[in-house]
């Protein structure tokens, strides 16, 4: 080693230059994706380019359950409440998920309303141009129909209004986070505690 040079410290494999990942195809890939999107839009015309309608759901786990997002598909209960047969739904651009369960009335009602709004705006083309069936849209509606580009019926997240108030001693005494933790713990142990109480009762009777 001579002079004030950097000490070589490269831990390379032999012929490492043959395995370098390059991104020279990035602009072409971007163009290819764009062309593919355009081709798909033509292929699925007059259906919306964004795909089928999806429900509004709450995220899982404690971290995300306050936030809403689009789900996989509507439940059978939601479809039934909206008066849409489960076999018909996928044919008119509604995603169906038979595994999802409705755990709150509020969520069920909001998705049923979403389905009803969608159904009211829906324009159904006849399978055969000359054979118009019941439920198909009128000739005037078909003439004015256009393909929906981008997101349709997006999720509108409400911004809750906040107001400033003076803190009282009562407010300070309430520990909201601790209260939530306690309730979650009680829920988790409810079954075990009930079983223990039942066992204790049996022992007393003996």
Swiss-Prot record:
Regions annotated as coiled coil: none
Protein name per UniProt: Large ribosomal subunit protein eL13z
Gene Ontology CC annotations of this record: ribonucleoprotein complex; ribosome
Family classification: Belongs to the eukaryotic ribosomal protein eL13 family.
Annotated organism of origin: Brassica napus (Rape)
Pfam families for this protein: Ribosomal_L13e (PF01294)
Keywords, sorted A to Z: Ribonucleoprotein, Ribosomal protein
MF GO annotations: structural constituent of ribosome
PROSITE patterns, A to Z: RIBOSOMAL_L13E
Compositional bias (Basic residues): 186-195
Region named Disordered: 183-206
Basic and acidic residues compositional bias, start-end: 196-206
Gene Ontology biological process terms, A to Z: translation
């Amino acid at each position: 080693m001579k002079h004030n040079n950097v000490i070589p410290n490269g831990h390379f494999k032999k012929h490492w230059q043959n395995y370098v990942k390059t991104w020279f195809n990035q602009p072409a890939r971007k163009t290819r994706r764009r062309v593919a999107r355009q081709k798909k839009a033509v292929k699925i015309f007059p259906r919306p380019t964004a795909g089928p309608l999806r429900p509004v759901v709450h995220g899982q786990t404690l971290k995300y359950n306050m936030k809403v997002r689009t789900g996989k598909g509507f439940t059978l209960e939601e479809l039934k409440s909206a008066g849409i047969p489960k076999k018909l739904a996928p044919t008119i651009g509604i995603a169906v998920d038979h595994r999802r369960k409705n755990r709150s009335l509020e969520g069920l009602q909001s998705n049923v309303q979403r389905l009803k709004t969608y159904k009211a705006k829906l324009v159904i083309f006849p399978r055969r141009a000359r054979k118009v069936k019941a439920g198909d849209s009128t000739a005037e509606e078909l003439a004015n129909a256009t393909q929906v580009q981008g997101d349709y019926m997006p999720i509108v997240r409400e911004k809750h209004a906040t107001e400033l108030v003076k803190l009282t001693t009562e407010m300070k005494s309430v520990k909201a986070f601790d209260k939530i933790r306690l309730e979650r713990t009680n829920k988790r142990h409810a079954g075990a505690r009930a079983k223990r109480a039942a066992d204790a009762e049996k022992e007393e009777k003996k």
